[in-house]
Amino acid sequence: MSEALKILNNIRTLRAQARECTLETLEEMLEKLEVVVNERREEESAAAAEVEERTRKLQQYREMLIADGIDPNELLNSLAAVKSGTKAKRAQRPAKYSYVDENGETKTWTGQGRTPAVIKKAMDEQGKSLDDFLIKQ
């Protein structure tokens, strides 16, 4: 809370500050404060009316579903099942390169991600290119 609001919220401090103002100034401040309070009340009542209207509409739709013989929980479950099943998995990329690691095992690499250390070392030290590791089809 800012210092100005702390002053307005404390009656003793407010009285002390009010002694330094004229009555006309205090009345002008009171009018402005009343305007602000009324605006806030209107905003809050409008928000409450929106919530009430939304709740009324939801209840109306629920009653329509029940009248048509549809259980609202069944509808939600079917929507959740459709939503969770929509994410399609993409196919795994085929291997593009083949190499022999330090243990003598033949391994493959798709060409995506970090270059395997064995391939990188061969390219740097032995002057090989990626084409040397291509899988021949």
Curated annotation (Swiss-Prot):
* Consequence the record notes for mutating residue 12 to C: Derepression of proV and bgl expression, normal DNA-binding, normal oligomerization
Upregulation:
Protein levels rise from about 4,000/cell in exponential phase to about 18,000/cell in late stationary phase (at protein level). Subject to transcriptional auto-repression. Induced by increased hydrostatic pressure. hns transcription can be repressed by overexpressed StpA (which is usually repressed by hns). Induced by cold shock (42 to 15 degrees Celsius) (at protein level).
Q: What is the lineage of its organism?
A: Bacteria, Pseudomonadati, Pseudomonadota, Gammaproteobacteria, Enterobacterales
Originating gene: hns
| Segments of this protein annotated with the region Required for DNA-binding | 92-137
Name the site position(s) for Interacts with Hha.
Answer: 12
Subcellular location field: Cytoplasm, Nucleoid
Q: Does the keyword Mitochondrion apply?
A: no
Q: Per the UniProt entry, what are the Gene Ontology biological process annotations, in alphabetical order?
A: bacterial nucleoid packaging; negative regulation of DNA-templated transcription; negative regulation of single-species biofilm formation on inanimate substrate; regulation of DNA-templated transcription; regulation of translation
Q: How is it modified after translation?
A: 2-hydroxyisobutyrylated by TmcA on Lys-121.
- For this entry, the protein name equals DNA-binding protein H-NS
Q: What is the effect of changing residue 30 to A/K?
A: Wild-type function
Q: How is its activity regulated?
A: Hydroxyisobutyrylation on Lys-121 (K121hib) decreases the DNA-binding activity of H-NS, promotes the expression of acid-resistance genes and enhances bacterial survival under extreme acid stress.
Cite the InterPro entries for this sequence: H-NS-like_N, H-NS_C_dom, H-NS_C_dom_sf, Histone_HNS, Histone_HNS_N
